[in-house]
Swiss-Prot record:
Lineage of source species: Archaea, Thermoproteota, Thermoprotei, Desulfurococcales, Pyrodictiaceae
Gene Ontology MF terms in the entry: rRNA binding; structural constituent of ribosome; tRNA binding
Described purpose of this protein according to its UniProt entry: Binds directly to 23S rRNA. Probably involved in E site tRNA release.
CDD domains reported in the protein's UniProt record: Ribosomal_L1 (cd00403)
Annotated gene: rpl1
Subunit structure: Part of the 50S ribosomal subunit.
Name of the protein in its database record: Large ribosomal subunit protein uL1
Keyword Ribonucleoprotein applies: yes
Coiled coil start-end: none
Length: 217
């Protein structure tokens, strides 16, 4: 992206790290991309894209797997929670329990044949939280999929013309955070009609820190 200089992104990340007050917890580094002239009411204008970052943020990402059989057995070794078919059936009509699971899970990986059941029980609680169930084939390597999604972020623009996601943590090397930012920006570039025009601002900030705008060309 020629209009987003790497040195400008690097400078913004360094400044965000320097000016943010220290907290008694590990802060995330967030990327905010402000868009313009995008019709969010049209299907073409909505953005909902999973991005696998090249450098996983040093913050635990909770992965839940909805599966049965052999996949459920293997998932118990790597996932933060495994939801069996019986547990999903128990969520029918139990919105409170579904919401609790949706709040706990950052990602929900679903064995494909359980998607209809997840759609009826868990998906209504995931949607308002900007989360979606991810279907995988019954013979998928669940350990590899869980590992991959620990590095994943969701790009989403639905109600506001902007995309916000975590691209690192304050204890990561600056160059890794910058790499992650460019992975997000390149993904966005492929989804926008005219990235140079549609991207109005690129902002970096820590969880509790002030925003720092990247100087675009």
């Amino acid at each position: 992206m020629s209009f987003v200089p790497r040195e400008a992104v690097e400078q913004a990340v360094k400044e965000a790290l320097e000016i943010s007050p220290k907290r008694n917890f590990k802060q995330s580094v967030d990327l905010i991309v402000v868009l313009r002239d995008i019709d969010l009411r049209s299907p073409q204008g909505r953005i909902r894209e999973v991005v696998i970052l090249p450098h996983p943020p040093k913050k635990h990402v909770r992965i839940c797997v909805a599966a049965d059989g052999d996949m459920a057995v293997k998932a118990k070794e790597v996932a933060d929670r495994v939801l069996t078919r019986e547990e999903l059936q128990g969520l029918v009509g139990n919105r409170k329990a579904a919401k609790k699971i949706a709040e706990f899970c950052d990602w929900v990986i679903v064995k494909a044949d359980l998607m209809p059941l997840v759609g009826r029980t868990l998906a209504p609680a995931l949607g308002p939280r900007g989360k979606v169930p991810i279907p995988v084939p019954p013979n998928a390597n669940i350990a590899e999929i869980v590992k991959t999604y620990r590095s994943a972020v969701m790009l989403r623009a639905k109600d506001q013309p902007q995309v916000m996601c975590r691209v690192g943590t304050e204890d990561m090397p600056v160059n890794e955070i910058v790499d992650n930012i460019f992975k997000v920006l390149s993904t966005l570039e492929g989804k926008l009609p005219n990235a140079r025009h549609n991207i109005a601002k690129v902002i970096v900030k820590l969880t509790m820190g002030p925003p720092v705008e990247v100087k675009l060309r």
